[in-house]
């Protein structure tokens, strides 16, 4: 069991696989700059949530859903999850998370499919095009402890986004 929580960048290979041509890798120290600009972080000393940033520009047409790669994976204790919510400022513009909340389980970390690289699915429910700029805060995440009722797990995670239960 992990005792500490941490946001870690996924490998260069995973970043290139997830971002493709949507990110500029020309800077030899792109990892350092990426980490400084887009690492999840709390805005104030007592903020409960970590702000989550879009490393890429995305234009969402009305009704469109985009899966935005973050470039990060999350290490956390096995009795916790990382719960992702839309920023309230986006909710007032009719932009939301299709599932209401995205939940990252602790066993998502380092999964063989995508190293635990977490994405944020966002939907434009408005009737207008909506643009997310590179560096915009798009969501916020909270570490939350959970409890089980003693049931036995039926499988071990082997995949990435949307893989549990398959």
Q: What do these predicted regions represent?
A:
Residues 1-166:
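DUTPase catalytic domain/fold
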């Amino acid at each position: 069991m992990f005792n500490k929580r941490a946001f870690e960048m996924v490998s260069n290979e995973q970043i290139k696989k997830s971002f493709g041509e949507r990110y500029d890798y020309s800077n030899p120290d792109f990892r350092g700059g990426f980490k400084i600009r887009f690492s999840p972080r709390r805005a104030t000393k007592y903020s409960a949530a970590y702000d989550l940033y879009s490393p890429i520009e995305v234009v969402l047409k009305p009704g469109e859903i985009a899966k935005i790669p973050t470039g990060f994976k999350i290490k956390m204790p096995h009795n916790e999850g990382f719960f992702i919510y839309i920023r309230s400022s986006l909710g007032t513009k009719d932009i939301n998370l299709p599932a209401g909340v995205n939940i990252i389980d602790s066993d998502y970390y380092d999964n063989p499919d995508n190293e635990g690289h977490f994405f944020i699915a966002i939907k434009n429910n408005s009737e207008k095009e909506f643009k997310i700029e590179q560096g915009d805060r798009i969501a916020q995440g909270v570490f939350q402890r959970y409890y089980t009722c003693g049931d036995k797990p039926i499988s071990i995670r082997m995949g990435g986004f949307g893989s549990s239960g398959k």
